[in-house]
Structure formats: structure tokens, C-alpha cells
Amino acid sequence: MLPLIANSCRITVLKLRKKEIMTTVSAIEFDAKSGNYFCKVGSKTIKSYSKPYVERRVKAMVGDVEVAMAAAVEKSNRYDINTRFGFVEKLVNMVATGVQPSAVITGEGGLGKTYTVTKTLEANGYKDISDLADFQVGSVINSRRCFTMIKGFSTAKGLYRTLFENNKSIVVFDDCDAVLKDPVALNLLKGALDSYGKRIISWNADMKDDDLPRSFEFTGRVIFISNMDQDRIDQAIRSRSMMIDLSMTLDQKIDRMEFIAKSDEFLPEYDATIKADALALIRKIKSECKEISLRTLIAVSKVRASNKDWKDLATYMLTA
């Protein structure tokens, strides 16, 4: 059990996932005016005329954080990060084959979530129609074997239009976290993500002079790729979707980057030795780096390939 802290301080209990599980414990003080002892634990204040009671409550609350830490550590150790990315492929396969209408994939950006989803869909024979300019005029497109990527999308009405225009297809929402926070958009998604019966999506607001229907049956499928923590996503979405959490520790990020760097598709213009040297430097100074992602590895690999005395420049870029 963590000891009761005699003065105000921050205790970092866990730095395992994207966010830290931490608590701030203040000193126990006495308020002469009210006759109560009080102590702040995080955002909560414990108050009582009995100092031993306050001490017991503080120790219990800090203990709860320790329990959460232990559970998170156990879960993380059970499945390594590359295994979890393999789970993403399996889940996307289920969406592609119509077994599952929706999936939510969460975790920090820049480590291959979008790449894994798109490559898995393409491996299942789906075409990316995100940019219709890539197709010749008059081309026949089988919408049931297509997917479209939506980025930076913000309004509920925009969501309604997107689902209507891409009905029968797979819609991939990439980093559209605003949609997951909008109450109206969430209600629309509930209809789109249900896994039983007809999925009817309705828009009750005035649509005068608009080409959208008031309601329609959605027969497509949805994949969300989000940088949000899984527990911040609305319960209604979580209960209707299958979810994979790709939150990573610093070491897991580098393990994932090492796995990707060994692929022939990653920076094929550079020798494997160059990528290995770049990765070794990142691993050495990982705790000092401002950011660690595939973009980091790409940047350091370029510096390694272009400069004989490359380490100082690369270190400066990563840490300054």
C-alpha cells in the first residue's frame, strides 16, 4: 500500500496506457472553524471530525488506484502489441465479410492503425473510393465491395449524409473523435451500429430544400479509428461494437516500430541497417523524446541515410 503523504505531492501510480493513472494526495489539515479534518485525494475531499477516519479513507482510495494499476499491468502483459494488431486484422476481416457490422479501434496515432485497417480491407477485395477523382467518368463501382475513409468530420448532419451516401459500403471514420462526443451524432450511430434487425437511421430536424430523406435503412458497416482512450467512448457505442485497444507503453511503441521496420514495404528505399540504427538510437533516448511514432522513425532514418555524423542531429531533433 502506498504511504500517506505528509505534504502535497503527485504520485504517478501508472504510466502504462496513453494516459497516466495518478492521484494527488494533500496533507491532512484541521479546520478550526468547522472542527473537521480534511484531505484532498485527486478531485475528492474527505472531511470528518475524526482524523483516523480521514486517514483510513485516504489509504483506501489510494489502494483502489493500486488495484487499477495491477489490473492494467496484467492485461497489458497478457497480449503483446503485435498480437493485438493481429486481433485488429481479424476484427476487420469480420466486418469485411459481414459477420460484424461495426468495429472500434482505439490507441495513439502514428503507429499503424489506419494502415492495418486499409490493408486488411484491400486484402478482402475492397476498393478505396475515398477520392472519386481516381476513377474514370462512367466507371461502374460495386458499392458493396468498397470502403471510404472519412477524416476531420464534425457535424451530426454531415454524419447523416455520409451514412446515406455510402449506404451498402464500409465507412471508416479515421480520427473523427468529434462525432463520438456529439449527442445527436451518437443517436444516429446507435441506429447504424445495431447488430440485430433492421438498422433504421432517422433525422427529425427540418430538412427543407435538402436532398436527404427523413430516414433510411442502413445496410453498410462502420469502422471507427480513434485516438481517444477506450473508456472515454460512449457506452452505447462500446456495447454495439467490437473493440480493440491499442494503447501502448513506450517500450511497446518501439517494439511495434521494430516489427514494422522489418517489413519490405516500410521505407524500401533504405537498407535494413539504416532503419535498425535509427531504431536503436530512438530506443536509447526514448525517455527524452518529445514524440515516438512511425514518423519519428522515418525522420531519423532519413538523417541516418544522409549524414555521416548523424547521431547528434537526430538526437537534437528528437529532444530539443
Where are these regions (language model features)?
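Walker A/P-loop nucleotide-binding motif
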Residues: G98-V117
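Conserved AAA+ ATPase small/helical "lid" subdomain
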Residues: D264-T319
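Short glycine-rich substrate-engagement loop in P-loop NTPases that contacts/grips substrate
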Residues: K127-I170
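N-terminal pre-Walker A segment at the start of P-loop NTPase domains
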Residues: M69-A96
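Short N-terminal "domain-start" leader segments
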Residues: L4-F38, K47, Y79, E89, ...
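Structural recognition of the conserved hydrophobic beta-strand(s) that form the central parallel beta-sheet
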Residues: V172-D174, I200-N204, E217-N227
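A short helix-turn-beta junction within AAA+ P-loop NTPase domains corresponding to the substrate/partner-engaging
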Residues: R232-D251
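Conserved catalytic/switch belt of AAA+ P-loop NTPases
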Residues: K181-F218
